[in-house]
From Swiss-Prot:
Pathway: Glycolipid biosynthesis; lipid IV(A) biosynthesis; lipid IV(A) from (3R)-3-hydroxytetradecanoyl-[acyl-carrier-protein] and UDP-N-acetyl-alpha-D-glucosamine: step 1/6. It is an enzyme of class 2 (transferase). This is Acyl-[acyl-carrier-protein]--UDP-N-acetylglucosamine O-acyltransferase. Its EC number is 2.3.1.129. One of its GO terms (cellular component) is cytoplasm. One of its GO terms (biological process) is lipid A biosynthetic process. Involved in the biosynthesis of lipid A, a phosphorylated glycolipid that anchors the lipopolysaccharide to the outer membrane of the cell. GO terms for molecular function: acyl-[acyl-carrier-protein]-UDP-N-acetylglucosamine O-acyltransferase activity. It comes from the Bacteria. Keywords: Acyltransferase, Cytoplasm, Lipid A biosynthesis, Lipid biosynthesis, Lipid metabolism, Repeat, Transferase. Belongs to the transferase hexapeptide repeat family. LpxA subfamily.
């Protein structure tokens, strides 16, 4: 179903069964598959390919040569009906690739809202990207990676399968991330190691001075105290009882399977 207010360029191919919302814009030479849903006000600039069971929300801008919902690169994939979901108000720049999930990974690749995916960024099968994240040029997420809200991943950075990039993290460019990055942390290098707390980013997002001090104290317990990881976790949990900002650390530890970067 194509809303009567949507614009479809004469050279675009929109297959029967696709749903195109009000005021959406499908530009020259775009291809939209039969199981695709594109929300109100979303713009496909030109030469964009959207395939598979893909749902895109409203007011997104998707630039030329982006490919969304295509068959993933997992060799186990055998054509199962897996999905891609993208939220609202994202900017997906030129040549970005976002692949559909696998049944082994839950069947869904998900991108939230208000994100910026710069040129050539890659979001592999079964990844989850939160809200207000930035993936800079050529940033690459392997399968099953989770990127939490407000995280920034620098250009040319590669993230290993199943890693977690915590909320408000900043990963420097040309890094290789092979373990989980705790929330609020600046990481850099190959393999990425911690370089402190993302204080400037947190200030811009309105964190209180008291909250920043608590986050720094949690970071020191984890990385500067000389304690074992289990000992640091216990003391951080105690700190989280008094400071809600620190709960992000305890929640991260519960999810982490690869262990925090060291």
């Amino acid at each position: 179903m194509i809303d009567k207010s949507a614009f479809i360029h004469p050279t675009a191919i929109v297959e029967d069964g696709a749903v195109i919302g009000a005021n959406a814009h499908i530009g020259p030479f775009c291809i939209v598959g039969p199981q695709v849903e594109i929300g109100e006000g979303t713009v496909l600039k030109s030469h964009v390919a959207v395939n598979g069971q893909t749902k895109i929300g409203r007011d997104n801008e998707i630039y030329q040569f982006a490919s969304i919902g295509e068959v993933n690169q997992d060799l186990k994939y055998a054509g199962e009906p897996t999905r891609v979901e993208i939220g609202d108000r994202n900017r997906i720049r030129e040549s970005v690739t976002i692949h559909r999930g696998t049944v082994q990974g839950g069947g869904l690749t998900k991108v939230g809202s208000d994100n910026l995916l710069m040129i050539n960024a890659h979001v592999a099968h079964d990844c989850t990207v939160g809200n207000r994240c930035i993936l800079a040029n050529n940033a690459t997420l392997a399968g099953h990676v989770s990127v939490d809200d407000f995280a920034i991943i620098g250009g040319m950075t590669a993230v290993h399968q199943f890693c977690i990039i915590g909320a408000h993290v900043m990963v420097g460019g040309c890094s290789g991330v092979a373990q989980d990055v705790p929330p609020y942390v600046i990481a850099q290098g190959n393999h990425a190691t911690p370089f402190g707390v993302n204080i400037e980013g947190l200030k811009r997002r309105g964190f209180s001075r008291e909250g920043l001090v608590a986050i720094r104290n949690a970071y020191k317990l984890l990385y500067r105290s000389g304690k074992t990881l289990d000992e640091a976790k216990l003391e951080i949990a105690e700190l989280a009882e008094k400071h809600p900002e620190v709960k992000a650390f305890t929640e991260f530890f519960e999810r982490s399977t690869r262990g925090p970067i060291r």
